[in-house]
Amino acid sequence: YFTTPNQMKSFFATPQLNDYWAFSDGLCSVPNFQDFLPLKILQEHDKIPGGTFIINGQTGDYISGGHIPEALMAPSISADILFSAIIGKHFSLWKSLKTPKTLNEIRAELATRFKITFSKNIDREEAIAIYERFEYEERQAKYVINGQRNYELLGLNWVLPFWESDVVNFWRDVPIEAKFQQKLYRNTVDHWNYRGIFRDIKTTVGHWPGIRKLILG
């Protein structure tokens, strides 16, 4: 189900949005409410049967290697390249905040947390491990999985099969070459192609409107 811009705008003026923010706030990220309004509307129209379990795809692209940047695939990585990869992915949405002072503070924090020495290069496996660990601790755990609060406030059950221990442990041990650009995952689903869903079903991916540049700065 897709919500319209007018529906979303109206939703922002309702007490329910404040209720959701208070319910989902874990003092670690802004609330993730992207599923809340569509599911709420579906509930109001009796489209979700009792006892339903919500299963989303979080976070299959991340654990299967889809977030590994090409810049980290060289045999030896400098600290600056690793820092640039992390900053480019996680600290570049608000351009006005990317000041030299802020970037230096981020670099210092990363160097301390991961015991990185500027004068020494890092081998590829360690650099990617640091990159993925940072995303796991700072984005996946704090923001992405916070989206499950959407279902809880609406009284819906949920499961996250891609975060089951067996699945996570499997991808943890897959060689970097097979994870980069999701090579193993893509080859597997292309060969398996269960009921044609990986080749025959076309999806539409929406994009933010051009005004995002004005909003984000």
Task: Describe these PLM feature segments.
Residues 1-126, 147-198, 210-213:
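ATP-dependent adenylate-handling active sites, centered on carboxylate activation for C-N bond formation
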Residues 133-147:
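Core structural elements
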